[in-house]
Each structure stands twice: as structure tokens, then as C-alpha cells.
From Swiss-Prot:
Interacts with the polymerase and the uvsX and uvsY proteins. Signal peptide: none annotated. GO terms for biological process: DNA recombination; DNA repair; DNA replication. Keywords: DNA damage, DNA recombination, DNA repair, DNA replication, DNA-binding, Metal-binding, Zinc, Zinc-finger. Homodimer in the absence of DNA, monomer when binding DNA. The gene is 32. This is Single-stranded DNA-binding protein. Binds preferentially to single-stranded DNA and therefore, destabilizes double-stranded DNA. It is involved in DNA replication, repair and recombination. Binds ss-DNA as the replication fork advances and stimulates the replisome processivity and accuracy. One of its GO terms (molecular function) is zinc ion binding.
Length: 47
């Protein structure tokens, strides 16, 4: 089983892996949120 030896080592590994600092929302077809006139929300989420 995996055992963590050092939290500092884990943080260093995560810093190396986390090259992308956030979610890219360039693709508008992937996430859509709409409100109708009454204020009701509707979302389409595609994976």
C-alpha cells in the first residue's frame, strides 16, 4: 500500500504536476447556463 513519507515531498510533486493552473473555458459548447424570464436556471454540462 502507498505510504506518504513526507508532506513536503508530496507538495513538491504536486507543484511539478500542476502545470495547468485552472479550468479552460474556451469551449463554449461544453458548459452553458441559461436563465429564463422568470429567473429559473438551466445548465447543460457535457463530458
Amino acid at each position: 500500500m502507498f505510504k506518504r513519507k513526507s508532506t513536503a515531498e508530496l507538495a513538491a510533486q504536486m507543484a511539478k504536476l500542476n502545470g495547468n493552473k485552472g479550468f479552460s473555458s474556451e469551449d463554449k459548447g461544453e458548459w452553458k447556463l441559461k436563465l429564463d424570464n422568470a429567473g429559473n436556471g438551466q445548465a447543460v454540462i457535457r463530458f
